[in-house]
Amino acid sequence: HSFPTRRSSDLAYGQMRSILMDRDVRSMESALRQSVTTVDGQIEVYDNLSNYITFNETVSGILSYNYSNKYEMYSQIVTTFDPLVSSLKYFHNDINKVTIYINNGIKHDTTLAPLSEIENEAFYNSAVNSTNINWYVDKDKKELISARKMSTLATAGITGIMYINVDYDSI
């Protein structure tokens, strides 16, 4: 006579286990959706910052202008270009580096550098050929990088890459 009781307790246990597993799966799915939404929001912020510099006429004007002497160029870079580009790091602590790499060999602090510095990087070929924002993750170096070709410089005959390195652990 104990057989039906055991069978019903086994059935009840199975149903309870199934209910708890379903609840756990829904909870994990919800947590994952929240995480994805958070990361998407963070990436959107960095994309907007990339757009801000990439399509900034002042930035492209300074980099494409035909200066009469080095001092004039240096003055524009220090007084106007640097503050614009560096402001991204000041307002977003999780940004490690913002650099515009260009093909004219100019180097200034961390904001401006020659393309040759990144020609051997994994992201270079796709970035130099696309004005879309491309994201790259290097798990070994713990780097999260946004890189894209700057169309505003391309129209002036200059190859330029907008590069943002974000703190890997902040995402």
PLM features per residue range, with description:
Residues H1-S8:
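Short, small-residue-biased leader/transition segments that mark boundaries at the very start
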Residues I19, R23-A31, I100, N132-Y136, ...:
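N-terminal sensory and localization modules of signal-transduction and trafficking proteins
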Residues I118-E119, D140-I171:
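Conserved beta-strands of PAS-like sensory domains
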Residues S9-D10, G14:
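Membrane-embedded alpha-helical segments of multi-pass transporters/permeases
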Residues R26-N132:
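Extracytoplasmic/periplasmic sensory segments of membrane signal-transduction proteins
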Residues I102-N104, D138, T152:
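Acidic surface patches and DE-rich sequence motifs
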